[in-house]
Amino acid sequence: MRECISVHIGQAGVQMGNACWELYCLEHGIQPDGQMPSDKTIGGGDDSFNTFFSETGAGKHVPRAVFVDLEPTVVDEVRTGTYRQLFHPEQLITGKEDAANNYARGHYTVGKEIIDLVLDRIRKLADQCTGLQGFLIFHSFGGGTGSGFSSLLMERLSVDYGKKSKLEFAIYPAPQISTAVVEPYNSILTTHTTLEHSDCAFMVDNEAIYDICRRNLDIERPTYTNLNRLIGQIVSSITASLRFDGALNVDLTEFQTNLVPYPRIHFPLATYAPVISAEKAYHEQLTVAEITNACFEPANQMVKCDPRHGKYMSCCMLYRGDVVPKDVNAAIATIKTKRTIQFVDWCPTGFKVGINYQPPTVVPGGDLAKVQRAVCMLSNTTAIAEAWARLDHKFDLMYAKRAFVHWYVGEGMEEGEFSEAREDLAALEKDYEEVGVDSVEGEGEEEGGEEY
C-alpha cells in the first residue's frame, strides 16, 4: 500500500482537516464512528482508501492523521464534534499556550516543547504503514503555529524520513483582508525555512475563496466552514487518485514529477470547477468542455494572480465522475487553439490528465451542488510570482521600520533571520522570472557578449 499521513497544524490546518475528513468519510461510506457498513461495498470492494485510513481489529477505520495546535480550543471542537469517535485521542495533540501569531514562538519557544510528542505520534502512524508514501501538511502561512511549528516539523520530518514526499496545503494571506498584522513576517519566515523541505506546496488564498463563495455560490457572508468545504473538495480531488482506483491513476510522486520543473519552483496553482450552487446546477448541463474552460478563468483560481500575464510550465487536469478521455482530448485541443494560455518555450504544451470514475461527493446540506463531473486543475505558472511580490512588498514596508520585530527577537530569534529570509524570497521571485524568459533569447545574448 502507498499510505499518506496527513498532519493538520494550527487553527487553519485543523479546520481544513475537519472539512477534508468529513468529505473523505462521505466518499468512502465511513460513518462518524469509523464503522463501514458492510453493505456499502461500492465498486466491488475497492480498498484503495486504506492509503488514508487504517483499519483496526474491530473493523473501525481510523484516519492516518495528526491534529496539532499549540492551544486547545480549536482541537477541542474536534474532541467534542460529530467525528470525535473517528479519531484516536492520541491523534489530537494540543499545547497549553498558543503561538500568539508569532513565528518565533511556534518555531522556537513553544513549538520545541511539543515537537517530540508530535514526532512520536507520527512515528506510531508511520509504523502502521507498509509503504509510507509521504506526508500532507495542512497549515496557514499567517498564524504563529501554522508558520512556525509547521516549518519546525518539516525540518524534523526531513531528518527522520529523508526521502519521503512532503506536500503542503497552505493558506496564503489574502491581499485585502488580514487576520494578523504580522502575517507578512510569518509567511516569509516560514516559506524560507520550508522551501528546501517541501516537495510541492498548494497555496490557497482566503480572499480568492471568499470571492468564489460570493460569486458562484451566492453566499453573502462566507464563513470559514464555507471556505473549508470548498478547499476540502480541492484536496479531495487532488487525493482522489490515491484513494480510488481510476483509469489514469496518479500518485504523490507522480504529481511532483509532472508539476515541479525545478526544486524551488514548487507552488502550483489550483483551480476547481464547477463551483455551483444547487439551484443553478438544476438548470445547467456542465459538459467536459465547459468545466475545462472554467479552469482557465482567473476567477476560479485559489490564489489571486493572473496567469494571462505569466507562462505555464506544466498543467495537470484531474477529472472525476462521468468523463471519457475523448471529451477531455477535445476540450484540451480547443483550449490550445485559443492560445490564451502561453507555455514556456522549453516545455511544449504539457497537459497531464488523470481520470477518476468516482463522481464528486458533496456534504449534505452544504453549499455545493451535486454534479456528475468535476475537474481540478493544478498548473505551475510563473504568474504565482505576483503573490510572492505582493507579500514581499508588505514585508518590506514593515521591516523598513523594524515594526513588531522585537516580539520575534524576544522569543530567541535573530534579526539576521529576517533579512536572510527576505533575500531567499527575492531569489525565489528571480527564479520565477528567469524560468519565464525565452531560452533562445538568452543564448543570443551570451553569444553577443563574446564578441566584445
Swiss-Prot record:
Record: residues binding Mg(2+): E71
InterPro entries in UniProt: Alpha_tubulin, Tub_FtsZ_C, Tubulin, Tubulin/FtsZ-like_C, Tubulin/FtsZ_2-layer-sand-dom, Tubulin/FtsZ_GTPase_sf, Tubulin_C, Tubulin_CS
Region of interest: Disordered: 432-452
Compartments reported by the entry: Cytoplasm, Cytoskeleton
SUPFAM superfamilies cross-referenced by the UniProt entry: Tubulin C-terminal domain-like, Tubulin nucleotide-binding domain-like
UniProt PTM comment: Undergoes a tyrosination/detyrosination cycle, the cyclic removal and re-addition of a C-terminal tyrosine residue by the enzymes tubulin tyrosine carboxypeptidase (TTCP) and tubulin tyrosine ligase (TTL), respectively.
Positions of GTP binding: Q11, E71, S140, G144, T145, T179, N206, N228
UniProt name for this protein: Tubulin alpha-2/alpha-4 chain
